[in-house]
């Protein structure tokens, strides 16, 4: 494993950035169940701004990580299976990481970004159900793009989590396939 204290510090910093996400999501859920008024519309715009600020902080967090926290593409499945539910491998890239801890923290980061985007999309669609609002249209495009990217990267990490052969640190430490 890399610098354990550095890894814990990065994980702690991610937690501090993400700590308000459940509250933000709860506020959005409550707001979106209310009738529209000038004050609730302003609140929705404020929630969008706040979720975008948290997302920006998450992106900044990712930019501070050392190079060994980045994934490497170990393989690519090009063929689209007939039935995704029974496919042996997910189509697309297969990412590997230095160890499972790092992969888990990176996926926590991705989920946090998805939560931010869900608030943006929820508030924007509540403000403009027809999708024609110059205040929120570009925010929606960005939110959809970021969400798709995060989902794709989480999906690309699944083979790493499911295959001992893709986990270099476990093998280096002499762990067997059961993690012992």
Which residues does each PLM region occupy?
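C-terminal amphipathic "assembly/sorting" segment characterized by alternating charged
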Residues: 171-180
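A phosphate-binding catalytic loop at a beta-strand-loop-alpha-helix junction
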Residues: 167
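Central/C-terminal regulatory/activation regions of fungal transcription factors
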Residues: 1-128, 137-164
